[in-house]
Amino acid sequence: MRVLTPITGAILLAMACANAQAMSLTEAVQSAVDQHPEINASRNSRLSADEDVKFAKGGWYPRVDLVAGYGRQKSDNTNTRFTNPDGTSNHNKETLNYTQSDLRLRQMLFDGFNTSNEVSRTEAVVNSRAYYTQATAQSVALRAIEVYLDVLKRRELVTLATNNLQAHLRVNDQIGLRSERGVGSNADLDQSTARRALAENNLYTAEVDLADAEANFFSVIGRYPDELETPVTIKGEMPASLLDARQDMLEHNPYLKSAQADVNAAEQQYEVAKSPFYPRLDAVLATGANNNTAGQVGHDNNDWQAGVELSYNLFRGGSDKARLQSDAHKINQAMDIRNNALRTLNEDLALSWNAMTNARKQTPTAREYADTSTRVRAAYQDQFGLGQRTLLDLLDSENELYNANRRYTEVRYTEEFSMYRVLANMGELLNKQRISLPPEAIAQSEVKSEARLPDMR
């Protein structure tokens, strides 16, 4: 049995801690969804809409008002006037401190369907805000995936640039020694120095790009990237064709569902605008207690009332008709916004699908290019040992290998991110990544978009 030394144990413990602290792609996306301000703003918008529903439902409940008053009142009426014994009239006036109190209960019996339609409108707004919160979470998730993959890609490019520079430094040192001994030419030395400077510049550029990628990562995820796990490819989760992806987009994309809910809300607003054309009927129950009013000292007008009241507007200068027509135009506006959203999403889906297809076609050739360049470099090194290649030939092979590996790295990550873009446009990104949504992103009822492009009929 092998016994671990303290140093070996410490190294293994450090490696275990590093692996334990490595952030996965799902963890990064979940962190962004949980903390990003854009999603929190959408959540508060949904919570506000929930309160609007409660406000609208208040129209079904009775209204109770208490009115109380205190003041000084001067009266000149039949209560203060009297006839003198000689038959003459005495116009006496009384100034008294009075108190008034009234308690009134009013219950709506019929309001032209205003309350029920307003409740339906606010509930449609709740669905719109919920689906918009989903859409915002999906956009943030896609952005989180983009910055996550970008950091991984930039780190690989920094490694490639570092290896390329080290190779140039080794060859440059050898050419310098040959030049000092009079074996090599100054032209070879200058050319080697120029290529080494270019390799240094490539490394500086790669390091700056990595710093930018890490800054973007912090902005989206809310923390700096330390150890990141390389995610497993999602090729197996892609639809078979663009047509299948488009159909999934129509059924699942939350932006379309939010836009459709806005159309539903506009239609209910139109129904609300019809209520002024109906009479309103209320049940009224009231009681009052007054003191020192109308010139009478003491309690008077202590009465109660129970009945129904009907009010019906006959003319309002055409305002109600104008509002109805305005809300009709708002329905058309909401439908146009929904249809435009479909066109934009369909375009984004096609572009992401094309990018994925293009990168998928280029990946095998880019890999072949990188593998071939690796073999060429090895062959050049062997031939250099036999005197068949120069040091500049070795630099050529190093540059070719660097460009090939960089191209292969870029194509791989482009293909991977394009697949995530396709899932996002389909509305399946959060589900495929098993991301938990906040409760404010859950709609009260399912909404199916009625938007269609001409070629989808």
What are these regions (language model features)?
Residues 1-21:
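Gram-negative bacterial Sec-dependent N-terminal signal peptides
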Residues 41-56, 136, 140-159, 170, ...:
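Amphipathic alpha-helical coiled-coil segments
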